[in-house]
């Protein structure tokens, strides 16, 4: 450091010496010359020096002044502009931005705003060429005489500063490190850029660019966002007094902010109105009248996650991350227009359905557990240190342990000291309340909420039409539609599809009976005897059609089919139909849905059946348009025949059997869609071990829906099927959504029947056969994974809330009769 200072001091000393030599040489040139010639020579020399200085700054001579934008950069400015997300029905559903800015044209702004701006910020705007020399002289005079400073920067200079970030983005070079010279170099660059801007653009373009780039405070960049933020209006509809408020803020956005400092804003607004009067743009009567108007705001600060479909928008951001990197775009600054598949009306129906059903589920969950702690192991015992383990994974715990490394008492004190904290609630429309809770208590409060996800998809395109990732994005950012959970009996779709692939039909029969088999237990590292059982632990001993076994979700038949068809082949079929998560191809329990998958891929796979065996990749974005209006991305429209038409047709019949067969687990869907008699519906419920995960998948020819319900941690769940089964929790979400969509005339195109068989090899005898009627009372607990001996190595993942399974499969007790539905 000392050597560096000595070098700088030495350089400065040499520079002073050389400067004195040059000045002495220059002085000697004019010894004996008349004074007027000396004056001219000095003036010309200063002018040439100034021009050379400007050129040196512009080209960054010897890296002394730092880089400046060239003409190419000025003609193609890179303003940070928000990217907008549009729904399929052309509704703006959100933005991605660092600076919330949406450009507008000159014509889209009220002309009085331009007059207001020029009268206040740059009264000689139309007569100068970027630099107002009269203004400079006036500012210098005021500074010398002490009569108060006036601004000398023109609108063009302010644009140069705002658009090209001269004071931050571009360095000031070596000379800029010398005290006092940095501001001179910065102002010089602003003059140069302002002159270039005047050469490249007309005056209206400069005004437009200025209004689109300037910061109006409160996170509002540009006139369009400012008009919306402060007045909930458009630039075209701004009144004169509103324009005066916005222009007045430009002098100091905090001091004159109408929200935070209304008195200052009022005084500044009135001064701006006086400026307009002085320049003849309003009359004295108009000025006095406008001054009497109180400031009335409709203040709303737009945030990244305001509006609909927050989880969907986050999914879009994740999907486009790689595309943006590969194509040179920044999702948050490039001003892209992203057109998505989602329908804003269907999204509203989905969010309403989730809210309505989850309020009921949460109330049931609270009443069900009462004052007991709901985090229990597979034996129903409270898990020790459950909350403490979660607290230790929180950032606040890591901060406190770093601050007090040798003082655990201080850490415990702060973790257990109550303080006001905003938490989620179903008790108000804002879904938020403030409670006095400690860190420990807030964690305990939040983990008791039940969660959900919902997806609606078009089977003919793979386009997602509605997407709910959880109950509140503000409180839980993790998207449950992509969470890995056990699908339970919803996975049986693939078991029976492979059975159809291998020549079986819905009317072929299998017996519901006890059997056992030797399997490898990865935990014990030995072979064990595995006895798959039905949800109620009872086998009928009867032979039944496959459509009845599927509709009633008989586990023994599904496992037996899994062994007949081959687990690996079932997994291959699942992959072809749209499952991307890795499946345990060695576990017989895969037939009962023991491998984790997510709702989005499961919904996509069910679409394959609905679209006659054709698989379409899940699509969130249809096209992207850049800031210049050029189409830079169009979603590919491809499909492949994943399974045969015959298998798909027969599985359509199987899914419909879930609503039509006696004891079908999806029968309660009729309570929601019964009036839509012009549409075929089918479905499959699913519930994983201990009711930790509840599912429902609903299909119709033109729309497929899926819902998941469960705790954030698998150890948090209902204890009984009466409350925790997929038919009681997830199915109503799908039902409420379908009810709204089917009753809306705008969605008539989603009505319809499945086609009659196109394959002459398909006969009615394959799927039209007598139903199976049980000789005993069946239970609702027929959609659960029930395996007496755990044959999977499923570990608890401590670093995430949604994790793998936490306990052994065990038989679920009989809870409720089907006739109670």
Task: Give residue ranges: language-model regions.
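A penicillin-recognizing enzyme superfamily signal
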Residues: 340, 344-360, 392-458, 463, ...
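Conserved catalytic neighborhood of penicillin-recognizing serine enzymes
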Residues: 145-171, 236, 300-311, 504-570, ...
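Mid-domain, small-residue-enriched loop/turn segments at the edges of structured enzyme/sensor domains
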Residues: 524-532, 564-604, 613, 617-618
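Non-catalytic structural connector segments
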Residues: 148, 283-341, 345-409
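N-terminal type II signal-anchor transmembrane helix
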Residues: 2-86, 124, 144, 361
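Peptidoglycan glycan-strand catalytic modules in the bacterial/periplasmic cell-wall system
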Residues: 6, 79-289, 311, 472, ...
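Short, well-structured active-site flanking segments
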Residues: 126-136, 221-223, 283-288, 500-524, ...
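Active-site SXXK
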Residues: 116-118, 276, 350, 461-462, ...
């Amino acid at each position: 450091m000392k050597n560096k200072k000595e070098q700088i001091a030495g350089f400065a000393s040499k520079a002073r010496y050389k400067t004195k030599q040059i000045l002495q040489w220059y002085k000697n040139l004019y010894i004996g010359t008349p004074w007027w010639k000396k004056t001219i020579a000095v003036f010309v020399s200063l002018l040439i020096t100034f021009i050379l200085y400007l050129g040196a700054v512009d080209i960054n001579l010897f890296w002394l002044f730092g880089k400046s934008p060239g003409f190419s950069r000025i003609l193609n400015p890179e303003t940070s502009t928000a990217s907008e997300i549009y729904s399929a029905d052309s509704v703006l559903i959100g933005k991605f931005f660092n600076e919330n800015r949406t450009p507008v044209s000159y014509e889209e702004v009220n002309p009085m705003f331009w007059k207001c701006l020029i009268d206040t910020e740059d009264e000689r705007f139309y007569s100068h060429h970027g630099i107002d020399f009269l203004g400079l002289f006036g500012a210098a005079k005021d500074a010398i005489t002490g009569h108060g400073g006036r601004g000398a920067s023109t609108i063009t200079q302010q644009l140069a500063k705002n658009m090209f970030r001269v004071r931050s983005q571009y360095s000031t070079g070596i000379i800029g490190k010398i005290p006092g010279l940095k501001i001179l170099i910065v102002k010089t660059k602003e003059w140069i850029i302002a002159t270039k801007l005047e050469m490249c653009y007309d005056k209206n373009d400069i005004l437009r660019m200025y209004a689109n780039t300037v910061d109006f405070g409160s996170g509002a960049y540009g006139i369009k966002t400012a008009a919306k933020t402060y007045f909930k209006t458009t630039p075209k509809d701004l009144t004169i007094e509103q324009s005066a408020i916005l222009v007045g803020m430009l002098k100091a956005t905090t001091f004159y902010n109408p929200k935070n400092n209304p008195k200052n804003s009022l005084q500044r607004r009135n001064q701006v109105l006086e400026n307009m009067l002085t320049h003849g743009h309003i009359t004295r009567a108009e000025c006095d009248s406008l001054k009497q108007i109180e400031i009335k705001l409709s203040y709303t600060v737009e945030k990244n996650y305001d509006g609909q479909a927050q989880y969907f928008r986050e999914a879009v951001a994740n999907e486009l991350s790689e595309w943006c990197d590969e194509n040179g775009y920044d999702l948050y600054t490039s001003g892209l227009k992203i057109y998505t598949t989602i329908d804003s009306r269907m999204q509203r129906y989905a969010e309403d359905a989730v809210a309505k059903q989850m309020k009921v589920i949460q109330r049931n969950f609270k009443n069900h557990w009462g004052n007991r702690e709901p985090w229990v192991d597979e034996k129903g015992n409270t898990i020790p240190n459950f909350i403490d383990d979660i607290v230790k994974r929180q950032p606040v715990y890591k901060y406190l342990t770093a601050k007090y490394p040798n003082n655990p008492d201080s850490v415990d004190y702060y973790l257990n000291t109550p303080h006001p904290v905003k938490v989620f609630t179903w008790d108000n429309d804002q879904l938020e309340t403030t409670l006095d809770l400690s860190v420990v208590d807030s964690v305990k409060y939040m983990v008791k909420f039940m969660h959900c996800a919902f997806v609606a998809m078009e089977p003919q395109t793979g386009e997602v039409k509605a997407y709910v990732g959880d109950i509140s994005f503000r409180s839980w950012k993790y998207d449950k539609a992509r969470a890995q959970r056990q699908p339970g009996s919803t996975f049986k779709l693939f078991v029976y599809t492979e059975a159809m692939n291998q020549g079986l039909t819905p009317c072929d029969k299998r017996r519901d009976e006890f059997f056992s088999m030797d399997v490898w237990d990865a935990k014990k590292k030995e072979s064990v005897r595995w006895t798959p059982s039905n949800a109620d632990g009872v086998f009928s001993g009867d032979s039944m059609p496959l459509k009845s076994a599927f509709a009633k979700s008989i586990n023994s038949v599904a496992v037996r089919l899994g062994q007949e068809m081959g687990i690996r082949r079932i997994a291959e079929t699942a992959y072809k139909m749209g499952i991307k998560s890795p499946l345990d191809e060695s576990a017989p329990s895969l037939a009962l849905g023991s491998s984790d998958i997510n709702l989005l891929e499961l919904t996509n796979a069910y679409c394959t059946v609905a679209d006659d065996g054709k698989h379409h990749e899940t699509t969130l974005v249809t096209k992207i348009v850049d800031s210049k209006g050029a189409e830079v991305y169009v979603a590919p429209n491809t499909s492949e025949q994943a399974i045969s038409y015959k298998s798909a047709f027969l599985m359509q019949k199987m899914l419909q059997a879930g609503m039509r067969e006696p004891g079908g687990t999806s029968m309660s869907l009729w309570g929601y869609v019964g009036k839509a008699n012009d549409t075929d519906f089918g479905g499959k419920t699913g519930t994983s071990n201990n009711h930790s995960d509840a599912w429902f998948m609903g299909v119709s020819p033109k729309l497929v829906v899926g819902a998941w319900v469960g705790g954030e941690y698998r150890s948090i769940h209902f204890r009984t099927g009466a409350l925790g089964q997929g038919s009681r929790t997830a199915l109503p979400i799908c039902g409420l959504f379908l009810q709204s969509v089917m009753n809306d005339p705008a969605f008539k195109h989603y009505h319809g029947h499945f086609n009659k068989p196109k394959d002459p090899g398909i006969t009615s005898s394959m799927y039209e056969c007598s139903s199976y009627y049980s000789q005993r009372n069946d239970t609702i607990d027929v959609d659960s994974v029930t395996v007496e001996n755990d044959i999977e190595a499923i570990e608890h993942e401590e670093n995430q809330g949604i994790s793998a399974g936490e306990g052994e499969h065990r038989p679920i007790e009989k809870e409720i009769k089907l006739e109670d539905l």
